[in-house]
A protein has these predicted regions:
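Residue-level signature of the transmembrane alpha-helical core
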Residues: 14, 37-40, 69, 97-100, ...
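Core segments of transmembrane alpha-helices
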Residues: 12-19, 70-79, 106-107, 129-141
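Active-site His/Glu-centered metal-binding helix of metallohydrolases
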Residues: 15, 44-52, 69, 73, ...
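Membrane-embedded alpha-helical segments that form the functional core of polytopic membrane enzymes
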Residues: 16-65, 78-98, 156-171
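Hydrophobic alpha-helical transmembrane segments of integral membrane proteins
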Residues: 2-3, 11-15, 64-67
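Residue-level signal for threonine
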Residues: 10, 60, 123
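Membrane-water interface of transmembrane alpha-helices
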Residues: 104-112
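C-terminal membrane-associated helical module and adjoining short loops/tails
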Residues: 1-7, 17, 27, 35-43, ...
Length: 194
């Protein structure tokens, strides 16, 4: 049973997504709060599933496959919803596009490399990028309530969320470039062996 807990958490993160979308569209404070809580739970399980798998030595191929997919689904869904409702707008949309584009490119690269049995390990900077993305999205989801709780003169929850979104977009570019470079190097070295 212990071996299954990390995968159950990962699958649970995917199952949360439709409920998150539903809560996002519920009107009023309780809809916003429910969407925020679901996003935070999903974000926390991202940390928890990997930690438990490593701690108990129960890492699995299924977890290796599903974990990055679950991350991308929740982050992409949240970013799209925040753009659609105007929370992320104007030039800020560029940061969301950078994040989404990188996720698609790296997913394709990982799939391509997996065919050659080449693993592309997650870097510490990529982990930091994910944390920044999730914190920025949580702040943006917190809405007016978050702005009342976090309000330092010119910086409220929304402003800090946008700043962190841009920081995560910058890290996204850097880590995306690093992964692409390593992936292309692997692919070219494999071609040279043939």
């Amino acid at each position: 049973m212990l071996k299954k807990i990390p995968n159950i958490l990962t699958i649970g993160r995917i199952i949360i997504v439709p409920f998150f979308v539903l809560a996002f569209y519920l009107p009023g404070f309780y809809g916003d709060l429910t969407a925020l809580i679901l996003f935070i739970v999903a974000s926390f399980t991202d940390f928890l599933d990997g930690m438990l798998a490593r701690m108990f030595g129960v890492e699995s191929k299924l977890g290796e496959l599903l974990d990055p997919i679950a991350d991308k689904i929740i982050v992409a869904t949240a970013l799209i919803l925040l753009v659609m409702d105007g929370t992320i707008r104007n030039y800020e949309v560029i940061a969301a596009i950078i994040i989404l584009t990188r996720e698609i490119l790296i997913s394709g690269l990982r799939e391509f490399l997996a065919k050659g049995k080449i693993k592309l390990p997650v870097s510490n900077l990529a982990k930091l990028k994910t944390v920044l993305q999730m914190v920025s999205i949580a702040l943006l989801l917190s809405g007016d309530t978050g702005n009342k709780i976090i309000d330092f003169e010119d910086y409220n929850a929304q402003t800090i969320g946008i700043i962190l979104l841009w920081l995560s977009a910058a890290l996204t570019l850097f880590t995306g470039y690093d992964y692409m470079r390593k992936g292309i190097d692997h692919a070219m070295s494999e071609d040279n062996k043939d």
